[in-house]
Amino acid sequence: IKSCLFNEIGGNAIFINGEFIVPATTQNIDVTDCHIGNYGRIFNNSIGILLTHAIDCDLTHNEIHDGYYSGVSVGWNWGYAEHVSCRNNISYNHIYDIGQGWLSDMGGIYTLGVQPNTVISGNVVYNVGCDESAYGYGGWGIYLDEGSSYMIVENNLVYDCSSQTFHQHYGKENIIRNNIFAFGGEG
């Protein structure tokens, strides 16, 4: 999927849904140089790019903005359960004006589950805001949720988020290095 425009979308702009089978059959998919804006206009909990149960995919050089939920979400098994997602690359994306105070428990970039050798690098993420009335949590810039492990998060610029600019719910053996995280609402 290259150089496409997605605008005024009712749900997810791009949904790549693999099966949880070994070996994984959803692999080697590139989403690059796309412009994704104003998604989730009917189903507010929609995502700009949603990638589940996939291997060796590149989500790079995309501009994603003005969604009510997460910009990019990758993974899809809760906790440390066996999982096929690995070696995915989320790099050099420009993600902004996400959440806009509509929902909570989301991020500019969101991951879920064990994902060995997945890389989140060189992204610029800002203006991520959650619904303050929903206990005021979950407007995170980069959000590694339950079990997100064995990943590299490096060289990202993340700022102006209603919660933290980086949040690890629980996980292990992640490498977080050389990022700039600034102006999170909770620290």
What are the functions of these language-model segments?
Residues I1-G11, T25-G40, I55-Y69, V84-G99, ...:
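Right-handed parallel beta-helix
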Residues I9-V22, I42-L51, Y68-Y80, L103-L112, ...:
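Extracellular beta-strand/beta-solenoid scaffold signature
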